[in-house]
Amino acid sequence: MRRTSTADRRQARLSSGPLPGLERFEGGIDEAGFGPLLGPLCIGFAALEGPGDPWIALSGAVARGPSRSLPAVCDSKVLYPGEGGLGRLERSALLFLSLARGTRPRTIRELLEGPFSPTRETLDRHPWYRDLDLPLPRFVPHELLEADLARARGACDRAGLRVREAGVRAIPEGEFNAGVTRSGNKADFHVGLVAEVLAHLATLPRRGEGRILVDRLGGRRFYGDPLSSLLPEFLPTPLREDPARSEYLLHGAAAGARLSFCVGGERLSFACALGSVLAKYARELLVERLNAFFLDRLPGLRPTAGYVADGRRFLE
């Protein structure tokens, strides 16, 4: 398991401790694919509600770092590297999608279903994404997933924890490029996409105040103006905008929700870390489809992960 400093543990407690006298609603958002040259942008999102920290509530069922025996929820950049990385992502992603939806997605297409499902027409404009009815799981035995689910459900019941939402918003390359052109730059388009996802999380019914944490988007520090433009109905009020955290209080239909953009958000929020896992899992499955499409037509071509230098090699 990755070691954490005393400061990290203290910050995690301050950031994720229960709200006084209320059940704790925690939402989180993270992305995979904003920097690479090839493949989709995937935005993972999750929300949980209960009286305490989900990492503590699920400590016997879910690990906080890579584990041989349990599914893990942590930064995907920690969980994915090394042999079996996609299997580790799959084990955790399918567990929480099952907890949120009541059923496990059976195909890649079902994995992408939800409030931000890409339309079939959008996917069909990308021929490498037409074959998304491949069965899931790909890497983890069904029996192991069922055992994980039974263990996690028991832990949730004992702790009074509910997985309110879990999903992925996938933006294929053509949609991404068109959006960047409309917005004028990648950063503004990205903020617009994230704003729509956080609006969904912020307006989920909840029993009290809530907290939504987004892993900070690049080097951006000030979100007040774009949030006011994109979500005027929430009247976002800045609470702090410093190098480590930008925090806003939301009003209107999201009244009582506190929104934070944080450096290293996956260390501070279970929901944000889960968003990271969901986004990375979906992106890797879709990049695998992209590779399969082109390798079938160009024998000898080496697969790509989509990052800039290797993506250019793939395109040559």
Language model: regions and residue ranges:
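RNase H-like, Mg2+-dependent phosphodiesterase core
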Residues: M1-E316
